[in-house]
């Protein structure tokens, strides 16, 4: 497609966009009486307008029923998590038995590591990406120490080659093969939070399985961003949060995937709780833990219904819009941002702003990460003052995520015009 950095072109694309109306289903922040340009769906998604309605329903049922709401609410609380499963399974490409919403992201990963990181004297190493999200690194470090191992010996981090920003997948595969006899687990982010690089999870899973290791993924920046097929890819386990692209509010409930190969085996060691116990016998208050089959068997406590009500409001939208349709728009929208950005940068060659996200659309989601070469955080702060909500990551990267559910081509054009004005001011005043 031939792009144009003009308002008329952007508005025409919005008129042609079959998903454009979904933007009206979200609240857009207004600061000082002006609607801001919001490009941080990769950090915290916008609030669905139906969220309040869903929460109010649960508040009304609580007021009406008290504890009996577990069984008599419009959506009975005892099984509330189950209504989130179909749409969640669609988003990650899983059987419904392989998915459940529960807890929060790093908590869920710790629970999954109990079952799927089982180091032995021979197989104890974990291969992961360098510069992964810090919470994931803390997860790996503390899990390894929990087993009495030294992180320096057990964790192998794959870095970009010198002078590059992205990790080459052939280097990951080479590391897997080089450590074939000692590798217990390959654990990566589906999409790297910093660069926006999308990894080929099917390829990495196949490589890990080829040497007798397991493969797991943190999907925080992948779920709701790119289509996935975890079951078909034979991924062993995965976890995600729901407050980024899934728009469920800050710190809200997470989700997990456990491949049916494992989920159907109730003998797998895990940390148990009563919500993972056989649901037909849960309220008999028996002493012996009998886990359910499927991902539900990893649940610990009963569902946080208020948070799940917000998530339901967003998942309903995803189910209606369709992740494949959203991806099709996302590819075009992010490509337009890339075009607009490069058009402006080419006009201001003395100001070094560089995209470090893959240029290949199949190797990224919607996020573009921009490195402030030779500048500092003041450029980002000026962007914020100009009415753009973006995201800064130390030491020198601005992340922009044109989110297809609620961002428009006109948003991208206006962002470009804002960047142009800032570049002009930066050139004049530094």
From Swiss-Prot:
What molecular functions are annotated in GO for this chain? kynureninase activity; pyridoxal phosphate binding
- Enzyme class (EC, first level): hydrolase
Question: What are the UniProt keywords, alphabetically?
Answer: Hydrolase, Pyridine nucleotide biosynthesis, Pyridoxal phosphate
What is the top-level taxon of the source organism?
A: Bacteria
User: In the UniProt record, which is one GO cellular component term?
Assistant: cytoplasm
Residue numbers binding pyridoxal 5'-phosphate: 105-106, 133-136, 218, 221, 243, 274, 302
Q: Give the UniProt record's GO annotations in the biological process aspect.
A: anthranilate metabolic process; L-kynurenine catabolic process; L-tryptophan catabolic process to kynurenine; NAD biosynthetic process; quinolinate biosynthetic process
- What cofactors are annotated for this protein? pyridoxal 5'-phosphate
Question: Mind telling me which InterPro entries this protein's record contains?
Answer: Kynureninase, PyrdxlP-dep_Trfase, PyrdxlP-dep_Trfase_major, PyrdxlP-dep_Trfase_small
Spell out the reaction equation it catalyses: L-kynurenine + H2O = anthranilate + L-alanine + H(+); 3-hydroxy-L-kynurenine + H2O = 3-hydroxyanthranilate + L-alanine + H(+)
Q: Which family does it belong to?
A: Belongs to the kynureninase family.
The name on file for this protein is: Kynureninase
């Amino acid at each position: 497609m031939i792009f144009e950095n003009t308002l008329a072109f952007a508005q025409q694309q919005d008129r042609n966009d079959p998903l454009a109306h979904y933007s009206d289903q979200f609240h857009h922040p207004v600061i000082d009486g002006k609607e801001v340009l919001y490009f941080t769906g990769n950090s915290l998604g916008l609030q669905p307008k139906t969220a309040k309605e869903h929460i109010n329903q649960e508040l009304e049922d609580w007021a009406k029923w008290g504890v009996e709401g577990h069984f008599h609410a419009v959506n009975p609380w005892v099984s509330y998590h189950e209504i989130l499963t179909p749409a969640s399974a669609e988003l990650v490409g899983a059987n419904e038995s392989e998915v459940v919403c529960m807890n929060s992201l790093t908590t869920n990963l710790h629970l999954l590591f109990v079952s799927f990181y089982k180091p032995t004297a021979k197989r104890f190493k974990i291969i992961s990406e360098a510069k992964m999200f810090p919470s994931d690194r803390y997860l790996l470090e503390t899990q390894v120490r929990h087993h009495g191992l030294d992180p320096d010996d057990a964790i192998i981090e794959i870095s970009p080659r010198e002078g590059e920003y992205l990790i080459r997948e052939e280097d990951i595969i080479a590391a897997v093969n080089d450590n074939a006899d000692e590798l217990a687990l390959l654990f990566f982010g589906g999409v790297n939070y910093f660069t926006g690089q999308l990894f080929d999870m099917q390829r990495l899973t196949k490589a890990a399985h080829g040497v007798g290791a397991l493969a797991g993924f943190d999907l925080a920046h992948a779920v709701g961003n790119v289509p996935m097929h975890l079951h078909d890819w034979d991924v062993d386990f995965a976890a995600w949060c729901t407050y980024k692209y899934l728009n469920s509010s800050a710190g809200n409930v997470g989700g997990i995937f456990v491949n049916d190969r494992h989920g159907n085996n109730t003998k797998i060691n895990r940390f148990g709780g009563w919500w993972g116990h056989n649901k037909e016998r849960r309220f008999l208050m028996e002493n012996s833990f009998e886990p359910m089959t499927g991902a539900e068997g990893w649940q610990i406590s009963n569902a946080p219904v208020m948070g799940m009500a917000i998530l339901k409001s967003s998942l309903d939208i995803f189910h209606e819009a369709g992740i494949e349709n959203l991806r099709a728009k996302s590819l075009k929208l992010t490509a337009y941002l890339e075009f607009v950005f490069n058009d402006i940068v080419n006009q201001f060659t003395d100001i070094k702003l560089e995209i470090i996200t893959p240029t290949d659309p199949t190797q990224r989601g919607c996020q573009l990460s921009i490195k402030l070469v030779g500048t500092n955080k003041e450029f980002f702060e000026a962007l914020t003052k100009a009415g753009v909500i973006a995201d800064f990551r130390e030491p020198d990267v601005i992340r922009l995520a044109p989110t297809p559910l609620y961002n428009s081509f006109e948003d991208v054009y206006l962002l470009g015009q804002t960047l142009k004005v800032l570049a002009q001011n930066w050139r004049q005043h530094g």
